[in-house]
Amino acid sequence: MQAATVVINRRALRHNLQRLRELAPASKMVAVVKANAYGHGLLETARTLPDADAFGVARLEEALRLRAGGITKPVLLLEGFFDARDLPTISAQHFHTAVHNEEQLAALEEASLDEPVTVWMKLDTGMHRLGVRPEQAGAFYHRLTQCKNVRQPVNIVSHFARADEPKCGATEKQLAIFNTFCEGKPGQRSIAASGGILLWPQSHFDWVRPGIILYGVSPLEDRSTGADFGCQPVMSLTSSLIAVREHKAGEPVGYGGTWVSERDTRLGVVAMGYGDGYPRAAPSGTPVLVNGREVPIVGRVAMDMICVDLGPQAQDKAGDPVILWGEGLPVERIAEMTKVSAYELITRLTSRVAMKYVD
């Protein structure tokens, strides 16, 4: 009997990369594998994508794991380096790094390195989180061009704040700032992540940085799914029924008795709970698939178990397969039901969930 298991479909992952190349045919691909590849497994994901042009991570430790695992493609530190003492490692490993503040720039100017570092200057075009403000960017860029430790030319990167809101006007403003600053500069350019790839073809430039859409999940909050853009779900969260019980009309189930059956029925108990990372906030009615059939969660999600209403005529039995999200049940639907973003759902699964890779 299978307990909580994440099944990762390598074929779907490769399909999605190819689909994104079709959407941005003139751009190179930075496959973003931060946060353990959005919960899909850092090394296995990178090894599944030998055709990616580069990989993007948030921490130096992630980049080092890629190198130790045999990944030789360029690796971009999306948030840059956090300590000047890391620069020799970045140089020796040929990592690319974002540079977004005075402390990082000064560290580069003062370092003694055997080889220069490939730099992506981060321009704050409107996210207002990381990056050099436009009014300070000219002088900052000039110092990078004069720095002996920076491989020339300097590349330029930014990030959209509201790419998933095509009518708000913010993305057009960010693009205008980005284009104005990049004009006449020789380096590579990148501003589009998942939302930019899908909705803003004029933002694709030299490199795009697919994140959640690479894993077949829509970055938009408009009830779309990855399938709407030709992508396939890579992760399926699965488990099994561990019991099937007769349940009488008028009886509650679970902690607090929050759900009471209106009919005689059969309940299934699934080996899954918030101890595995499934959202405790999932309300009654949240769907799961049992033997490929959609049935509702009933009662509260517990640490280790979830109850589902199989229906009075159900023939399901202990040991039968359950899909909590993934193939046949998009995680975007679970996000909508639970009010927990799909980003959080797929990245917060706990260590007791087994990982299985299939082709």
Swiss-Prot record:
Residues that bear N6-(pyridoxal phosphate)lysine: K34
Keyword hit for Cell wall biogenesis/degradation: yes
EC number assigned by the record: 5.1.1.1
Organism lineage string: Bacteria, Pseudomonadati, Pseudomonadota, Gammaproteobacteria, Enterobacterales
Top-rank lineage group of the source organism: Bacteria
pH dependence: Optimum pH is 8-10.
Family: Belongs to the alanine racemase family.
Pathway where this protein functions: Amino-acid biosynthesis; D-alanine biosynthesis; D-alanine from L-alanine: step 1/1; Cell wall biogenesis; peptidoglycan biosynthesis
Protein name: Alanine racemase, biosynthetic
First-level EC class: isomerase
Any one of the GO CC terms: cytosol
UniProt GO MF annotations: alanine racemase activity; pyridoxal phosphate binding
Protein's GO biological process: cell wall organization; D-alanine biosynthetic process; peptidoglycan biosynthetic process; regulation of cell shape
Keywords: Cell shape, Cell wall biogenesis/degradation, Isomerase, Peptidoglycan synthesis, Pyridoxal phosphate
Keyword Isomerase: yes
Positions of transmembrane segments: none
Cofactor (UniProt): pyridoxal 5'-phosphate
Subunit structure, interactors included: Monomer but homodimer in the presence of the substrate.
Temperature note: Optimum temperature is 50 degrees Celsius.
The encoding gene: alr
InterPro entries: Ala_racemase, Ala_racemase/Decarboxylase_C, Ala_racemase_C, Ala_racemase_N, Ala_racemase_pyridoxalP-BS, PLP-binding_barrel
Gene3D superfamilies named among the record's database cross-references: Alanine racemase, Lyase, Ornithine Decarboxylase, Chain A, domain 1
Source organism of this protein record: Shigella dysenteriae
Record function comment: Catalyzes the interconversion of L-alanine and D-alanine.
Catalytic activity entry: L-alanine = D-alanine
Catalytic center residues: K34, Y255
Residues binding substrate: R129, M303
